[in-house]
Regions:
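Bacterial N-terminal signal peptides
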Residues: 2-11
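Bacterial Sec-dependent signal peptides at the C-terminal "C-region" and cleavage site
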Residues: 11-17
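Mature extracytoplasmic or organellar-lumen-exposed domains after removal of signal/transit peptides
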Residues: 17-190
Length: 190
């Protein structure tokens, strides 16, 4: 009886396990790009479209109805090059969005660092594409991410190790990332 009760307690779902905030440096929109790219490499348009449709409402909400309609048309036309090109442009816009929201929350260390981690997750998904186009600048971009993160300061623990926020440094480093990447991302509306 004791064994049965103990096994029930172990097998019972824990309230702590009911909530999952995911990996802080993973960006769902970017992770979906990887799925779409892999499915299109196999010419599995149904699976690629299904992956896109999971994120479509989010894409429309963050990047506009026209962007979502463009991707809808790219999928309908089965234009692999435009699906990937326009989705990569969404990821570039997502970097900008995350940088902007991190700056707006720059005095909230936890929130700003989470948003910057999401931006870094987007960059990591784009890295294979970027390594072909700008291999000599990847480390420079990583350095800018590190310095942008450092510019968020550090609230310290009981004021030990506390460092102030440097908004200008944050802007300088995130702007350098966006400026370097912008020429590599084109958008072709439907």
């Amino acid at each position: 009886m004791v064994v049965l009760a103990a096994s029930f307690i172990v097998a019972a779902p824990s309230p702590a396990g009911a909530y999952s905030y995911g990996d802080p440096d993973k960006e769902d929109v970017a992770e979906t790009y990887k799925l779409i790219e892999a499915e299109l490499a196999e010419n599995d348009w149904d699976a690629a479209l299904a992956a896109y449709q999971v994120r479509r409402a989010e894409i429309e909400s963050h990047f506009g109805k026209d962007v979502a309609l463009t991707l809808d048309a790219n999928f309908r036309d089965k234009n692999k090059a435009l699906v990937l090109q326009n989705y990569r442009y969404i990821l570039y816009m997502n970097l900008d969005r995350r940088f902007t929201y991190a700056e707006q929350n720059i005095n909230n260390y936890a929130q700003a660092s989470l948003l910057l981690a999401k931006a870094k997750g987007t960059f990591d998904v784009l890295k294979p594409y970027l390594e072909i186009r700008i291999p000599n600048q990847i480390q420079e971009i990583r350095d800018h991410f590190d310095k942008a993160y450092e510019s968020l300061g550090n609230p310290g623990l009981f004021n030990l190790g506390k460092k102030p926020v440097d908004v200008e440094a944050y802007r300088r480093h995130t702007s350098a990332i966006l400026t370097t990447l912008k020429p590599l991302f084109a958008y072709t509306p439907a």
